[in-house]
Amino acid sequence: MISQFFILSSKGDPLIYKDFRGDSGGRDVAELFYRKLTGLPGDESPVVMHHDDRHFIHIRHSGLYLVATTSENISPFSLLELLSRLATLLGDYCGSLSEGTISRNVALVYELLDEVLDYGYVQTTSMEMLRNFIQTEAVVSKPFSLFDLSSVGLFGAETQQSKVAPSTAASRPVLASRSDQSQKNEVFLDVVERLSVLIASNGSLLKVDVQGEIRLKSFLPSGSEMRIGLTEEFCVGKSELRGYGPGIRVDEVSFHSSVLLEEFESHRILRLQPPQGELTVMRYQLSDDLPSPLPFRLFPSVQWDRGSGRLQVYLKLRCDLPPKSQALNVRLHLPLPRGVVSLSQELSGPEQKAELGEGALRWDLPRVQGGSQLSGLFQMDVPGLPGPPGQGHSATAPLGLGPASLSFELPRHTCSGLQVRFLRLAFRPCGSTSPHKWVRHLSHSDAYVIRI
């Protein structure tokens, strides 16, 4: 049983507020929660907080705070599960969960809360049941873009661009509008991996970890059967080997409760009948043993002068991806000693950009091709920088410099080597149009740290 539910923006602005029992301090409770949250040290706040006789349980999703309050002795895990389910429902009904979509669909959100919770007690979180009662249609904002015209050729003929999933396709509401009877039957399947790496100053690898998920977003009718074929060499644990190749190994794996595994052991096929909406089909983890080289290596060189306070940093970044692959939105973040007053730079490409900000150097590279090597020479004046004793120059890193961290995205690439071989649907709609299937592989950095 919960007393209140509210959604706050990242700045603490209340977007949604619902008082189920009338036994609280009103809307001031939301302001109290945000004051307690921002008053805590560090970036990681506890998901459960206490004030007087009231408990605050919250999750953060897409920059929003979803908060439930209660004065009862309730398991926090059950409330965290409820908040996670509410976040999924709001994303399914509104198309995506963000400050903009919530603001445009306030009436829809309140109608959902009225059906999910009655006097603070959970009634249902099943989309199959809720779709019979929710009458408000989602408001979807689609800004005009010239790129939308690129899919239309001469006399309306399709171009190659029309065969690519539109950027806003995966953010549509799962439930079709009553006035839109021509909504396509589509399935989006994403293999997403988060890479965490720690590299020592001598270049040796100290830690590597891959957290992977297979995410599904289905616009097909609930209960439509589908089969997902994974790489046949996929194995779990070090003792299991499959095929004649090197094998694609993970340490741990878990599946959604709706996944049937009769064909998994023999053919690495997952069979399921998912409901409409989003779900995580499979999660897996791999540590300390990647089948391929790390995507990036950094070779730093540091020179600093005792007398003038001049600091020179030369960075050489090598991309060890295959030549046909590329990394996007690459950013190198390098903390600097205090007191930097100027920066001069020499970059290896005109599309690159480097600037100072918040006590660090930010080096942005929009696109890095596999097998390429980029460099940057950065010279800074640090008047208050203490020089090394007994000598004018030093090649050791001064106090406050580093470690460097990288953020990037790797489209069509998985660090574990796991791939989706096929996605087959048993659903056959009326008419000649077959369901559209979109499969995407993506890796991105979670914590990619290189010591200087």
UniProtKB/Swiss-Prot annotation:
Signal sequence region: none
Top-level taxon of the source organism: Eukaryota
Gene coding for it: AP4M1
Subunit structure: Adaptor protein complex 4 (AP-4) is a heterotetramer composed of two large adaptins (epsilon-type subunit AP4E1 and beta-type subunit AP4B1), a medium adaptin (mu-type subunit AP4M1) and a small adaptin (sigma-type AP4S1). Interacts with tyrosine-based sorting signals on the cytoplasmic tail of cargo proteins such as APP, ATG9A, LAMP2 and NAGPA. Interacts with the C-terminal domain of GRID2. Interacts with GRIA1 and GRIA2; the interaction is indirect via CACNG3.
Protein name, UniProt field: AP-4 complex subunit mu-1
PROSITE patterns (UniProt xref): CLAT_ADAPTOR_M_2, MHD
Role summary: Component of the adaptor protein complex 4 (AP-4). Adaptor protein complexes are vesicle coat components involved both in vesicle formation and cargo selection. They control the vesicular transport of proteins in different trafficking pathways. AP-4 forms a non clathrin-associated coat on vesicles departing the trans-Golgi network (TGN) and may be involved in the targeting of proteins from the trans-Golgi network (TGN) to the endosomal-lysosomal system.
Keyword Ribonucleoprotein among record annotations: no
Keyword Chaperone appears in the UniProt entry: no
Stated family: Belongs to the adaptor complexes medium subunit family.
Keywords associated with the record: Endosome, Golgi apparatus, Membrane, Protein transport, Transport
Species the sequence originates in: Canis lupus familiaris
Residues covered by the MHD domain: 184-451
SUPFAM superfamilies: Second domain of Mu2 adaptin subunit (ap50) of ap2 adaptor, SNARE-like
Annotated Gene Ontology cellular component terms: AP-4 adaptor complex; clathrin adaptor complex; cytoplasmic vesicle; cytosol; early endosome; trans-Golgi network
GO biological process, one term: autophagosome assembly
